[in-house]
Amino acid sequence: MDVDNGEGQVQVHLKTKQEHYAVPDVPYAIDGTVTTVELNTFVNALLRQKDGSSDTDFDFLVFDEYLRGRLCDHLREKAISFEDAIEIEYVERFPAPEPQDCLLHDDWVSAVKARGKWILSGCYDNTLNLWTNKGKHILTISGHTAPIKAVDWISLDEETGRFVSTSQDQTAMLWQWNVGSNSVECVSVCKGHERGVDSVSVSPDGLRFATGSWDTMLKVWSAELDDAVEGSSKRMKESGVRTPKITLQGHRESVSAVQWMDATTLLTGSWDHTLKVWDLSLEGIKTEISTNKSIFDASYSKLNRLILTASADKNLRLYDPRTNQGSVVRNTYLGHNAWVQTVMWSTTEEFLFVSGAYDNQNKLWDCRSPKAPLYDLLGHGEKVLDIDWSNPKYIVSGGVDNTVRVFKSRKALAEEAETK
């Protein structure tokens, strides 16, 4: 057997956590040059022998990484002996998201957030827009005096929606939307930053929100409607002006990303090449991770407790904030052809995330597949500025082509199939 050339056979065990797809747990001898194509054929043949199953598309994990070429090359790259019995895990392939809608705006769409039946977008023409997730325009909201940079929902029920927006006009604005009358009012203007406000995130309980700015500051504000700012003048209270509860200094350049990790912990990413984890109970930095690029966006997963970054190059990077080796990258994801502007973990699928870049493309990834995305989500004609997967049914993105693109994910596709 000429193992060095990947010829000959390899002993494998085929495993799956999806019990209805399980095959007999015995060693199989397969050619070392197989790819996912041949493995799919082999597994489906075994399933037909077992119970007459129709063919299913699978992906294959070998040592916790998706197989994307020949098995022998994969093993050689990981320095795995060809003499060992190899365990291959197979999983049903995640279906390709399908394009649903293109929502036309009057200017660049720099911020987008979906919740329930609704999509909130923010534009460079200083306006916010509300849409249904079926593509119907509901409302245009004016108030900011410079381009919108970020948006987030505070709360939503059948009668009322509340959300926050941030802008290059150095403010954040709190809004209350009456769903029935389709009217909206600005409840508070949040002042305290000295430059544009680039990022925003609402706390898990909806009582606070955090903002990051070009002034390098991280600020935490009350999101409660009846909040009275201690020490504020009567004029400020009556005019709805709100000031921050906490101001945290530590970054040296723009705070381009902010996210609540839990009720008392915040993650920030910055153009100063660092990620910081903040402990609000101590009002200080808990962990700092140094990177080698400016960070445009960062996303933390509550499911796997890992952090992804989008940076001033073509790559996405994965970090573990729990490690003692703060600068070590756990994985790098290659696939975009220009700067990656935006990234977000799935809120329901532990291994999946989406990204958008200046190459006009969105991509859907599995964090166990660093060499290639699962799918390209095409449609934008210009740079992608923001992407959101808050609603598990829909992947939503905004870009320089003045559009919001809506893609149906597996949950929406499954619901459609059930109703047919």
Curated annotation (Swiss-Prot):
Please give the Gene Ontology molecular function terms for this protein: ribonucleoprotein complex binding
**Which InterPro entries does UniProt cross-reference here?**
G-protein_beta_WD-40_rep (IPR020472), NLE (IPR012972), WD40/YVTN_repeat-like_dom_sf (IPR015943), WD40_repeat_CS (IPR019775), WD40_repeat_dom_sf (IPR036322), WD40_rpt (IPR001680), WDR12/Ytm1 (IPR028599)
Where is region (Ubiquitin-like (UBL) domain) located? 10-92
Protein's UniProt keywords contain Nucleus: yes
Q: Where in the cell is it found?
A: Nucleus, Nucleolus; Nucleus, Nucleoplasm
Record keywords? Nucleus, Repeat, Ribosome biogenesis, rRNA processing, WD repeat
Any Pfam family the entry gives: NLE
Any idea what this protein is called? Ribosome biogenesis protein WDR12 homolog
Which species is the source of this protein?
Drosophila melanogaster
